[in-house]
Amino acid sequence: MRFHLPVPAVALSLAAWAVPAHANPTFSTFVTGPSIAAAVGGNSTIGFAYAGNKFVGSVYFNTQLYSTNLSGGGVAAFGAPVAAFAGGETYVSSSLGIGGFGPRDVYAGNQSLGNVYRFANDGSSQSLFASGLSGGVRSIAFDPYGLYGNNMIVATNTGNIYKVDSSGVASLLTSVGADTEGLSFAPQAFGTYAAGTLFVASEGLSSLLAITPGGLKSTVVSGLSVPEMVSFVPLNLGSSGNPVEGFYAASYPNNIQKAGASDFVPYIGHAIVTGEGGGQVYDIRWNGSAFVTSDIGPFPGQAEDGIFVTADIIQNPVPEPETYALMMAGLGVLGFIARRKRQTPR
């Protein structure tokens, strides 16, 4: 959602605030605003996803997606325009090559409609993939661990959370009852929650919630300021030394920002939640008896979608929802999740 005035974080249920014990992440521009504008006619960045040999992003109220190379250059239009994407924020994700989904095909949906579109990885073809969801699409992720059948997970602005299989058939997992934009899966046990559990960041509830495979939901942390995306820091982040590793996020309404892998190594296994209201970058961790939250920001600009990229997603065709680093058969393929923006700037 587009937001301008910071909303103060008030209370955290089941959690406590703490002063960061490490240096805050340092962000720098990865894809410039002018290069995006030259390709698609605007640079109010919203979605951004890693797709194996490229990144694919979206712009607010813009029908055309764009792609970049792995260095943030070579910005070009991706696929053909989709009229439905004119309705506001468009969320972008990439499939993992499991559960019947192809490796790193691109999927996108807009906040104005309950439809998801599929694009071939090279952008040469595209089609409507799933439709009829209640509420506009706010987030798309792929279950890398299997607790949710390796299906696509979609969140909508009505708070509905859907499982969507590889044929595009959707079934309701649960509803949190409010706008939800961030999705991610825990790469290991997180507090009392099992490895592979789905976590969602809800703007409407100002909370981080956990959702079991059976659809039971519980609040993990509340009182967050306009939580936008949630992503677990990959367990092997920075292990390869490859410069592509790191954290990437859309900085509305300007560009794409990146923080190097080393900046997030102190937070491996933690949940990172960005706040849309005032540049917050929340670190949420389990201290053995309770969840503890620290603000390790600021993020430059208004945070939109974001992703962690690690060696496993660079070298192997199996990444994860907006994060792409999970631990599957000894392979790290965690995942992050992010989200989209709202209709009228507020």
Question: Whereabouts are the PLM-identified features?
Answer:
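A short, hydrophobic C-terminal helix/tail in secreted or cell-surface proteins
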Residues: P319-R339
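Short, charged juxtamembrane terminal tails flanking transmembrane helices
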Residues: R342-R346
